[in-house]
Amino acid sequence: MSKLFWAMLSFITRLPVPRRWSQGLDFEHYSRGIITFPLIGLLLGAISGLVFMVLQAWCGAPLAALFSVLVLVLMTGGFHLDGLADTCDGVFSARSRDRMLEIMRDSRLGTHGGLALIFVVLAKILVLSELALRGESILASLAAACAVSRGTAALLMYRHRYAREEGLGNVFIGKIDGRQTCVTLGLAAIFAAVLLPGMHGVAAMVVTMVAIFILGQLLKRTLGGQTGDTLGAAIELGELVFLLALL
């Protein structure tokens, strides 16, 4: 289990992980690491939340929110934001399915992708600032949001097919079973309930699950399946939906 955690941490983040900690784990077995996604999200959100706490007293909530979001982006290498941008460029191009998938592979940023990035990043900053003004714990909110968003991404993997012939997303999409999905969602729910007591966190997770499930069905209808880019988009949108549900 520890090897899986470290392998997943190095796979979906840019945090330094000694190679020997994940040595001996075959790439084909990475799908089992889905159950570590909520824990990795918890770690990322906690670090980002700590940055907010340290900076809030010095520069106020808006700037603290800006830097906490920036730290979160740096820790993931913009991996998920890139997926969000590519997904929006492809889906909103209104082309054929094959052409959409080609556009999503294009490394150039299009108008729809750029607008999506601006909207999501600004929305996160504004929501975090508002939550802070309402006296909510940003550390707990971010930790729960990142855990839940990565946990609910399993909804785009279970019983979905990969829309391309090959790619990184193929490691997970269609490769996880019902038990792994339930364990992943269960861990995310536990983190949300512990960090945000009074059913506030669980209610926000339910809203997030519904939103991500609907997103998955829409993408399945549009693209014929899921890709690594759509998983990244689901994680970014899941974070935002969860935070919005806390308002």
From Swiss-Prot:
Pathway: Cofactor biosynthesis; adenosylcobalamin biosynthesis; adenosylcobalamin from cob(II)yrinate a,c-diamide: step 7/7
GO biological process, one term: cobalamin biosynthetic process
TM spans (from-to): 34-54, 59-79, 113-133, 138-158, 194-214
Cofactor list: Mg(2+)
Example of a GO MF term: adenosylcobinamide-GDP ribazoletransferase activity
Superkingdom: Bacteria
Cellular compartment(s): Cell inner membrane
GO cellular component, one term: plasma membrane
Predominant location: membrane
Swiss-Prot/TrEMBL catalytic activity: alpha-ribazole + adenosylcob(III)inamide-GDP = adenosylcob(III)alamin + GMP + H(+); alpha-ribazole 5'-phosphate + adenosylcob(III)inamide-GDP = adenosylcob(III)alamin 5'-phosphate + GMP + H(+)
EC number(s) stated in the UniProt entry for this protein: 2.7.8.26
Keyword terms of this UniProt record: Cell inner membrane, Cell membrane, Cobalamin biosynthesis, Magnesium, Membrane, Transferase, Transmembrane, Transmembrane helix
Membrane topology, as annotated: Multi-pass membrane protein
Pfam family of the protein (one): CobS
Induction: By cobinamide.
Entry's family note: Belongs to the CobS family.
Function: Joins adenosylcobinamide-GDP and alpha-ribazole to generate adenosylcobalamin (Ado-cobalamin). Also synthesizes adenosylcobalamin 5'-phosphate from adenosylcobinamide-GDP and alpha-ribazole 5'-phosphate.
PANTHER family with a match to the protein in the record: ADENOSYLCOBINAMIDE-GDP RIBAZOLETRANSFERASE
NCBIfam families: cobS
Protein name from the UniProt record: Adenosylcobinamide-GDP ribazoletransferase
Organism: Escherichia coli (strain K12)
Classification lineage: Bacteria, Pseudomonadati, Pseudomonadota, Gammaproteobacteria, Enterobacterales
Gene transcribed to yield this protein: cobS
